A protein has these predicted regions:
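Bacterial N-terminal signal peptides
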Residues: 5-15
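Intrinsically disordered, low-complexity acidic Ser/Thr-rich regulatory segments
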Residues: 114-146, 335-359
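Short glycine/serine- and small hydrophobic-enriched flexible loop segments
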Residues: 158-166, 210, 260-267, 435, ...
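Active-site SXXK
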Residues: 146-175, 389
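Active-site-adjacent helix/loop patches that line small-molecule binding or acyl-intermediate pockets
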Residues: 59-64, 68-73, 184-293, 297-301
């Protein structure tokens, strides 16, 4: 992968707001659009360095897809905004959204193609076979959707929990996993789900992908998501033998659809959105026990990085991000985080003590791609805000900031990336973006609290 493409989405819940009329939703959306556009424009991606280009700056502007859906006190959508930033839209572009759907048909999303990204193919000549959703050839905007990396594990979790809800298995159903000829042992389904979400464990993900194939869930997953108008969320090409086969250009997610999936997981009452075919989507698409289980795992996800920076708390190269705490299960007595095999080595206690929100989320990162998405909720006593934020990008660990540049070794293909030496996995532009978006939502929450005195009361 070459330059970067990122995609971010966010959904805000404002306790105390009443469900809006269509006209007020449009008005709130207009202000949210401009605030979100301003947050994106305020982040300077031009100084980001590229290990694959021997530490040179980015060759082109990054792709950034940001969407926000604001919610009322109980979690009903009241406003939405979506902004694209790319080499096509270097100053950002607001995406037209459809009220009540909180979706868009104004963007032609195409599958990720590394050769198109790095210039070996034409940037603008993708054929209809590359469309993620058909029928958008004449859409006014276009965007090549970055590979979601381990963020796609939320789709695997959704598929498994749909099978649980349909009575095809339970969270305590034992599953013995063999990958080809390799025996990986037996655990209950929940025993595979936990490490897949909280530590982003690939082996656990392989087990659940294979389970979905064996039980017919994988064959249904894309169709079920498409029926919810989440058609850009797709898992294709995985192996029914090993559970692997996770490839760019085959597994797809976009920010707005990712945010709406997290909106569903969050579980507000009543109508969440209406599909183009008139289906009314509610939180009951996933049962309350399944949503509660998944939210519990997301709350315990250990990688407080990407849109936040708590795992590298106190590092001179860290920038403020979403003000979250690292789950205690990953901390030693000195507050240092170890998540799976990732040792971060910083005392996170000062940042944990200063946390303002909890973040129920899933991250993902490879060399070429980085992502982070989840549900943000204000902690007690903090300025009320409640939203979902989703970021999908090509800002993988090959991209880094000037402060860690001395650690880069361009002759060492395995250990020469700055992340190996510093433990700073993401460019801090993403944490800065998380911080700026949270400040927008914090200000909107404070304004709503003034208008509605019960705003900060738990519903």
């Amino acid at each position: 992968m070459r330059p970067l493409a990122c995609c971010l989405v966010l959904v805000l819940a404002a306790p105390g707001l009443a469900a809006p009329r269509a006209s007020s939703a449009v008005a709130r959306s207009r202000t949210l659009e401009q605030e979100l556009l301003g947050a994106v424009r305020a982040v300077d991606f031009t100084p980001v360095l590229d290990w694959r280009r021997s530490g040179q700056r980015l060759a082109t502007p990054p792709n950034l897809d940001v969407a926000v859906i604001e919610l009322d006190a109980e979690g009903r959508p009241v406003a939405a905004a979506n902004v694209l930033l790319s080499r096509d839209y270097p100053r950002g572009r607001v995406v037209p959204l459809e009220p009540k759907r909180w979706g868009t048909r104004a963007v032609r999303f195409t599958r990720w193609d590394p050769e198109r990204w790095n210039g070996k193919k034409g940037w603008a000549d993708a054929g209809p076979e590359e469309d993620l959703v058909p029928g958008r050839a004449s859409a006014p905007l276009r965007f090549m959707a970055p590979y979601p990396a381990s963020l796609f594990k939320i789709l695997v979790a959704y598929g498994v929990l749909r099978m649980v809800d349909q009575g095809e298995l339970t969270l305590d159903t034992p599953y013995h996993f063999t990958s080809g000829q390799e025996d990986r042992g037996e655990r209950p389904v929940r025993g595979w789900m936990d490490p897949m979400i909280t530590e982003s464990n690939n082996g656990a993900t392989e087990a659940l992908v294979k389970l979905l194939h064996e039980r017919g869930g994988m064959a249904r997953l894309n169709a079920e998501l498409a029926a919810l108008d989440l058609g850009t969320l797709q898992v294709n090409g995985t192996s029914p033998v090993t559970g692997r086969g996770w490839q760019p250009g085959s597994i797809h997610m976009t920010a707005l659809d990712t945010a709406r999936l997290f909106l569903l997981i969050d579980g507000g009452p009543g109508l969440l959105w209406k599909t183009t075919r008139g289906r009314e989507v509610t939180a009951a698409t996933l049962s309350e026990p399944s949503r509660a289980f998944l939210k519990g795992l997301l709350a315990e996800q250990g990688f407080a990085e990407g849109l936040s920076s708590t795992v590298i708390c106190g590092d001179p190269n860290a920038r403020p991000g979403l003000p979250v705490a690292v789950p205690a299960r990953f901390l030693d007595a000195e507050g240092r985080a170890t998540v799976g095999t990732n040792v971060f080595g910083r005392d996170t206690r000062p940042c944990n003590a200063a946390a303002q929100v909890e973040f129920l989320h899933k991250t993902g990162q490879t060399e070429n791609y980085g992502s982070d998405a989840g549900i943000v909720r204000a902690l007690p006593g903090q300025t009320p805000r409640h939203y979902v934020i989703a970021l999908l990008s090509t800002l993988g660990y090959r991209y880094y900031d000037a402060g860690v540049a001395p650690s880069a070794n361009f002759q060492d293909e395995e250990n020469g990336f700055p992340r190996v030496v510093t433990g700073i996995h993401f460019t801090q532009t993403l944490a800065e973006l998380g911080h700026r978006v949270d400040e927008v939502m914090k200000q909107r929450g404070a304004a709503s609290a003034e208008s509605f005195p019960h705003f900060d009361k738990a519903p």
